[in-house]
Amino acid sequence: MASMSNITPDIIVNAQINSEDENVLDFIIEDEYYLKKRGVGAHIIKVASSPQLRLLYKNAYSTVSCGNYGVLCNLVQNGEYDLNAIMFNCAEIKLNKGQMLFQTKIWRSDNSKTDAAVHTSSPKRTVETENDDDGEAASAAAIDEQEGNADVVGLDFEENIDDGDAPTPKKQKLDNAKQD
């Protein structure tokens, strides 16, 4: 079993709803860590259990780090108030009490920002070339083709439709050779 002689204490954070945006959870450092710098590498983050974390179990979310490090968060299987997190530090840092370590942006399905109508049709474009003599007719044809109003020229899909049988395989040179 491996032993570690230089064990640093876990980073403890509390989840709080952001005062400016209710769809953002701030994770604030609870204890003082200024006496010991956090070196490059992975550090465990202990997230205090909180009812605010329940929002992460019901909605999609994105994690945003607030420094030169990455944060990975995972939900806990049998707990809706718990969160596992780890910080991957890229450079030595000092952490202070009350500092925001990371945030999560919650994407609620009932959020009015996501209820905007989405247009599924593509915008109409006209394609002009230098040699077009009849610009309006070509533009109309290009729009019709883009909307699917014109038949595709040069392709006959019906000739490729058979009775459902697989085509006969082609013979290769190795098929005729005798094997010992």
Curated annotation (Swiss-Prot):
Residues 156-165 have a biased composition (Acidic residues). Pfam families: TLP-20 (PF06088). Residues 112-180 are annotated as: Disordered. InterPro entries: Telokin-like_Tlp20_baculovir, Tlp20_sf. Transmembrane segments: none annotated. It comes from the Viruses. Signal peptide: none annotated. CDD domains: TLP-20. Shares some antigenic similarities to the smooth muscle protein telokin, but is not similar at the sequence level. This is Telokin-like protein 20. The gene is TLP20.
